[in-house]
Amino acid sequence: MIYFFLKKIKMKLVSWNLNGIRAVEKKGLSEILEYINADIIGFQETKAQDDQVKEALKNVAGYHIYSSSAVKKGYSGTAILSKKEPIKVTYGLGIEEHDQEGRLICAEYEHFFYITTYVPNSGSGLHRLEYRSKWDSDLLNFIKNKEKEKPVFLCGDLNVAHKPIDLKNPKSNFNKTPGYTQTEID
């Protein structure tokens, strides 16, 4: 259904975990984005403050840029690049506990919402599992509220490998790698 919806409105949506926007910028980010030529691009793990994101994207033409950075410098962060200016852009889930890490941006368009998110990792030994579970529940509520208005495209790094195909070396990583434990999969 989503595919047909996108074909009808003729848009190309992209999601990309950068693992550091400044490093990718040095490797030709603007040329890559020009080649991709997407209407909306969601970045995760920018690992930069908002001004650094804008600086890294200074050679990228034709996009409105929205960035959300973590209070902790060099950590997490998300961004949206959009050829068309959204009706409205919101940052975070509206819950202070979650909104310190720059993990979500929601752009509202005429016919849909586009959300880019970098979901918290449960951490080694699952030390952040309780926080992660709360985040997941709050994110689901956020999405359900948006869906009451119009369709939602959730894009990003969800930090979970639900099936063995989602991870390199699934047998040796099962129950050892954050995001690929039975507790998280359930």
Name what the model sees in each region.
Residues 22, 50-52, 74-75, 123-126, ...:
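Short catalytic/ligand-binding loop motif for oxyanion handling, primarily in non-cytosolic enzymes
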Residues 21-25, 99, 131-139, 180-183:
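Soluble or luminal CAZymes and related metallo-dependent hydrolases
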Residues 46-47, 52-122:
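Structured beta-strand-rich core segments of catalytic domains in phosphoester-bond hydrolases
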Residues 40, 61-64, 135-186:
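Metal-dependent phosphoesterases centered on the DNase I-like endonuclease/exonuclease/phosphatase
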Residues 94-95, 119-136, 171-176:
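Surface-exposed cleft-lining segments at the edges of enzyme active sites
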Residues 30-34, 103-110, 138-150:
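Short amphipathic alpha-helices and their capping/turn segments at secondary-structure boundaries
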